[in-house]
């Protein structure tokens, strides 16, 4: 959210209560390789007190929303030039991260709600089901492969030349978008 504000002036807003849980997200745009291999809908953990309104992101001509949740809002967005990727979810979370956050907030007497779609039968004494790992691995693999490895020149002169780096990223995005 800070990056969306810094680069595009998109303000975030406070939510009425903490958004916490594992939410269903749907793919909005299959033309970019960042979500290659994703199912039409996939699960991803979210945990935050603020959000950048989806209408602001959809209205920004320099951004391409890639995935969105009805409950959690925009999940993944990329700049049109492919150089900036923003995730409002927590693909890095392991099985117990939301559990630790929930128990921490209980200890602080913050009266947190149970994370949505996380504990089996909403029972916090049971081990949470890990339902997002495959898509997280795919996301990171695609990012490294398509946006870092294939778009990075390996000669010092090219690395230092910003115009060539931009052209490589844009060319890669245009070339691969036709495959979808």
PLM regions and their residue ranges:
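Acyltransferase
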Residues: 82, 87-180
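Short C-terminal domain-edge/linker segments immediately following a structured domain
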Residues: 25-28, 56-57, 75-78, 107-108, ...
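Cysteine-nucleophile active-site neighborhood
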Residues: 1-29
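Tryptophan-centric aromatic hotspots in well-structured domains and transmembrane helices
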Residues: 1, 23, 46-49, 101-102, ...
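Catalytic beta-strand/loop cores that center a nucleophilic Ser/Cys/Thr
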Residues: 35-83, 88-89
